[in-house]
A protein has these predicted regions:
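Cullin-RING E3 adaptor/co-adaptor recruitment helices
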Residues: 1-78, 93-137
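Amphipathic alpha-helical repeat scaffolds of TPR domains
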Residues: 79-86, 91
């Protein structure tokens, strides 16, 4: 009966913490057997929150990349539009606006790839926390 109570209490505390981070939970009021589980749940919650922010950034960058690609296509078709960018601007010389927008799209793509890598690392860390929680609940 005590173990079942601990699981239910842990689930309730975790739910409250995840729904509203401002709810104060005092370590002295939490049984020591549950404190580590709460820390793990909160870490998992933080990872998921960060992952959501990364998803939003990736989505915005994909939209910007698409705009850059469209501008590149538009300007490549109009060969009369030419300009030069100084060497110190992004370290890139362009013969026309199409090349410039292609360059912008490639930079955005590299940022998206970096964010995707970070999301993969977060997913792996989440899996570890979930395994840790699974092992804890199996013990209880």
């Amino acid at each position: 009966m005590t173990k079942m109570f601990q699981v239910k209490t842990l689930q309730a505390l975790a739910a409250c913490t995840i729904i509203n981070e401002s709810i104060p939970i005092f370590p002295s009021s939490i049984p020591s057997t549950m404190f580590e589980e709460l820390q793990t749940l909160y870490s998992l919650f933080c990872l998921r929150k960060h992952e959501k922010v990364l998803d939003e950034k990736v989505d915005r960058l994909k939209v910007e990349r698409q705009k850059a690609i469209e501008k590149s296509d538009d300007y490549h078709m109009d060969s009369s539009v030419l300009f030069a960018i100084n060497d110190y601007v992004a370290g890139f010389d362009a013969e026309n606006l199409g090349d410039y927008w292609e360059h912008c799209a490639s930079i955005i793509t590299s940022h998206i790839e970096k964010l995707e890598e970070e999301k993969q690392e977060i997913s792996q860390e989440e899996a570890l926390y979930l395994c840790k929680l699974g092992n804890t609940y199996n013990k209880i």
